[in-house]
Amino acid sequence: MASRKAGTRGKVAATKQAQRGSSNVFSMFEQAQIQEFKEAFSCIDQNRDGIICKADLRETYSQLGKVSVPEEELDAMLQEGKGPINFTVFLTLFGEKLNGTDPEEAILSAFRMFDPSGKGVVNKDEFKQLLLTQADKFSPAEVEQMFALTPMDLAGNIDYKSLCYIITHGDEKEE
């Protein structure tokens, strides 16, 4: 009986520890941020099974225009989760990556996904289409308002490094 009780106590402690570990990740973010991560997770979880798998990642990259992603790269992403990547694991991975990360660097990193050539610009029309159709969809008026403040090159491409500065520091550069 005592050994049975000790076994039960161990399971309860392990369960509480797992709950504590998973609940901590939710305390790292505000509710609005968690909702945004949930929307991102839903966009990546193409087959809607609650787990991000290699096929989900491949399809997500394909939708972003990156068709030939090496298997090793996809495997490396999945291995970061050290098991199935459900929403809690997804949130934990982002929490670990963003904890101590400069918000400006996080924004630049997101823009770099749409800049495979590394030129520091993204195509205005493609970016507009993404804003109108993906995740937290912008209204056409919101897109036009954003583009009014967005630095562009002569070809009409968005200079995302300057835009990132405006987002993180405000409209005016310090002298």
From Swiss-Prot:
Q: Which Pfam families does the record associate with it?
A: EF-hand_5 (PF13202), EF-hand_8 (PF13833)
Which positions carry N-acetylalanine?
Answer: 2
Q: Which GO terms describe its cellular component?
A: A band; cytoplasm; cytosol; dendritic spine; myofibril; myosin complex
Q: Which residues cross the membrane?
A: none
Identify the residues that the record assigns to the EF-hand domain, covering every copy.
32-67, 102-137, 138-173
Keywords from UniProt, A to Z, are: Acetylation, Calcium, Metal-binding, Motor protein, Muscle protein, Myosin, Phosphoprotein, Repeat
Decide whether keyword Metal-binding is in the record: yes
Q: Which InterPro entries match?
A: EF-hand-dom_pair (IPR011992), EF_Hand_1_Ca_BS (IPR018247), EF_hand_dom (IPR002048), Myosin_RLC (IPR050403)
Q: Which residues carry this modification: Phosphoserine?
A: 22-23
Positions contributing to Ca(2+) binding: 45, 47, 49, 56
Listed GO biological process terms: cardiac muscle tissue development; heart contraction
Which molecular function term from Gene Ontology is one that the record holds?
Answer: calcium ion binding
Summed up, the tissue specificity of this protein is: Predominantly expressed in adult atrial muscle.
Q: How does it assemble?
A: Myosin is a hexamer of 2 heavy chains and 4 light chains.
**Remarks, miscellaneous:** This chain binds calcium.
Instruction: Report what the protein is called.
Output: Myosin regulatory light chain 2, atrial isoform
Tell me what organism the protein belongs to: Homo sapiens (Human)
